[in-house]
């Protein structure tokens, strides 16, 4: 499973802004903006059944993200 964690849209992202500014300095003027995040690849023993999805959702909410300033997306596959 993959957990992607991103700052909420209303939260200022200085790292993303720094990357976007660097893109412009490198001549990549078509880059309008960048938001940086985190990606976690979680390996499971056994199938990604409902119990596993629930467990990884809890892990993402309680450990991998800060729900006050971040959202997460879980990709099962």
Spans of model-derived segments:
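Non-catalytic terminal accessory/regulatory regions of metabolic enzymes
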Residues: 1-77
């Amino acid at each position: 499973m993959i957990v992607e964690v991103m700052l909420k849209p209303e939260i200022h992202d200085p790292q993303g802004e720094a990357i976007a500014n660097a893109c412009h300095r490198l001549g990549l003027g078509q880059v309008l903006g960048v938001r940086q995040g985190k990606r976690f690849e979680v390996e499971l023993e056994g199938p990604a059944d409902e119990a596993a999805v629930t467990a990884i959702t809890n892990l993402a909410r309680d450990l991998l993200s800060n729900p006050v300033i971040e959202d997460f997306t879980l990709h099962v596959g």
